[in-house]
Amino acid sequence: MRLILIFFVVFIGFLSCSKSTNSSIVNNTTTPPPTTIAKQLVFTGSGFANNGNYPKVYTCDSSGFSPGLQWSNAPAGTTSYAITMHHFPPTYPTEDKHVYLVLYNIPSTVTSLTDNSKSIGAFGINTVDRKNSYTPPCSQGPGAKVYILTLYALNAAPTISVSSAQVTMDVLLSGMRNKILDSTVMTVTYTR
């Protein structure tokens, strides 16, 4: 009988500890803090977006003027933007990339460019006609060609130590080193 009584007391003690532990866990449970999702640059074009088709109007098969572009969600501290557009030919790396647009010193207050915009920012040179302007893609041969537009949010103006007639995409990228707060890529396709 004594053995049964000891067993009963131990059993009741075990249940009471177990119950107390469970309520303590429930009372001490906290809700994790909400997750903060960082803003990311959003970059689109007039009539096209990432992984879309590049409109004919912006190529040499039509008017060939520069595309309208829009962006939002710049990180804090952005003082200016830069935009490049290029593609890699099938013979890359034997043949260098083709650059169609090098545009920098776009004020942080600007969040869009209209079609054929020529008065905002500073143009570097393209590799097609070596002019300080946009030049339209003029894809050679059949099949889809992929073009890459990149938007850069900068915390300071690029360090450019050459004349504007010598600012290539590579010169600009070098001048933006350690000044890029964020960047985003828009890849588009054009088929002749």
Regions found by a protein language model. Name each.
Residues S18-R192:
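N-terminus-centered regions that define maturation/targeting leaders and the start
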Residues M1-I4, S18-K19:
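Positively charged n-region of N-terminal signal peptides that target proteins for export
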